[in-house]
C-alpha cells in the first residue's frame, strides 16, 4: 500500500451548509449559530483506491465525515497480520475514537475512490461543548458504531459471520 500524503489528498475547503449528504452526517442538525462557532476550515479531501487516510497510532488531526465511497478500518496483530475491524460507508464518521484518545486506533484505507471532509479536533471539541445539537448527533454516531460492533460480534458468536 502506498501512503497518500495529506497535501496530495487536499482538494480545498468544504461548504458544510451546502453538502449533498448533510442530513446523514455529523453536522445535520447544526443551525446558523452553530456554524458561526466553526473557526477553522473543514478540509475537502479525496483518496484513490488503497489510499491511506491515517495509520494506527497516528496523532489525530481530526475526524472525517465520509461523503462518498467506502473505507476499511484495519488493525495489525502482534505478529504483523492485518484484520479488518469495520467497513464504513457514506455518512459514517471515520476516526471517531480520536475524540476520546487524540490518536487513531486503527488504519483507515480507501476501498474505492473516497471523498471525505476532515474536521479538526479543535472544531469538534468546541462544537460538542457549545452545541447540544452536535453533541446529540455525536452520541448517535457513537451508538451506531457500537451497535454495529455488537451486531457483528453477535453474528460471529452465533455462526452467521463469514
Where are the predicted features?
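Cytosolic regulatory regions built on CNB/CRP/Popeye-like sensor folds
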Residues: 1-162
Amino acid at each position: 500500500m502506498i501512503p497518500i500524503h495529506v497535501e496530495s489528498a487536499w482538494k480545498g475547503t468544504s461548504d458544510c451548509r451546502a453538502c449533498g449528504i448533510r442530513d446523514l452526517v455529523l453536522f445535520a442538525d447544526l443551525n446558523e449559530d452553530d456554524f458561526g462557532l466553526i473557526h477553522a476550515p473543514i478540509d475537502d479531501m479525496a483518496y484513490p483506491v488503497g489510499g491511506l487516510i491515517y495509520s494506527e497510532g497516528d496523532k489525530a488531526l481530526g475526524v472525517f465525515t465520509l461523503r462518498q465511497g467506502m473505507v476499511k478500518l484495519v488493525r495489525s496483530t502482534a505478529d504483523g497480520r492485518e484484520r479488518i475491524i469495520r467497513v464504513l460507508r457514506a455518512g459514517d464518521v471515520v476516526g471517531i475514537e480520536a475524540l476520546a484518545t487524540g490518536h487513531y486506533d486503527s488504519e483507515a484505507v480507501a476501498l474505492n475512490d473516497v471523498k471525505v471532509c476532515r474536521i479538526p479536533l479543535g472544531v469538534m471539541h468546541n462544537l460538542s461543548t457549545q452545541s447540544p445539537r452536535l453533541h446529540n448527533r455525536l452520541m448517535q454516531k457513537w451508538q451506531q458504531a457500537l451497535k454495529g460492533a455488537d451486531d457483528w460480534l453477535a453474528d460471529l458468536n452465533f455462526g452467521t459471520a463469514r
